[in-house]
Design a protein with these regions (language model features):
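Small-residue-enriched hydrophobic alpha-helices in membranes
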Residues: 1-8, 35-123
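Short terminal alpha-helical segments
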Residues: 4-37
Length: 123
C-alpha cells in the first residue's frame, strides 16, 4: 500500500467513512454503510486496519474525549489535511488491549466487512 500522500484520492472516501467511530453519535447506525464503502475499496482488510489505526485514529481520536464533540462529521478537506499531518503510516499497529474503544469498533467493522464480502460473493 502506498503512503497516504501518494494515494489520497482513493483514501479520502475511506477516511470520511471511518471517522464515524470517533464522532459523538451511535456508530452502530452507520456500521453497514461504512463496511460497504470499505469492502468496495481497493484495500485489503489488513490495509483497511492500518488506515483505521494509523491514519484516521491519530487524526480524530481527540473527539471522543471532548465535552462537546463533533457529531455531524469533520469537513473532508480538514480531515484529509489533518490525517496527512499526523498519520503513523508504516508504524506498528497499536495494541488493541490498550485502546478498547477503538479495538471494539475495529472488531465490529472487520466482521461486517467480511459479511458484506461474503454476501457479495454469494449473490
Amino acid at each position: 500500500m502506498y503512503p497516504p500522500e501518494q494515494d489520497e484520492p482513493d483514501r479520502r472516501p475511506i477516511w470520511d467513512a471511518l471517522q464515524i467511530f470517533w464522532l459523538d453519535t451511535d456508530a452502530n447506525l452507520d456500521l453497514r454503510r461504512v463496511a460497504e464503502i470499505c469492502e468496495r475499496s481497493k484495500y485489503s482488510l489488513s490495509e483497511l486496519e492500518a488506515i483505521y489505526w494509523n491514519e484516521v485514529r491519530p487524526a480524530v481520536r481527540f473527539n471522543i474525549f471532548s465535552l462537546a464533540g463533533e457529531w455531524a462529521g469533520f469537513d473532508p478537506e480538514w480531515l484529509s489535511k489533518r490525517i496527512l499531518n499526523v498519520h503513523r503510516f508504516g508504524e506498528a499497529l497499536p495494541r488493541k488491549v490498550f485502546h478498547p474503544y477503538s479495538g471494539m469498533w475495529w472488531d465490529r467493522l472487520s466482521s461486517e466487512i467480511n459479511q458484506v464480502e461474503n454476501e457479495r460473493r454469494h449473490a
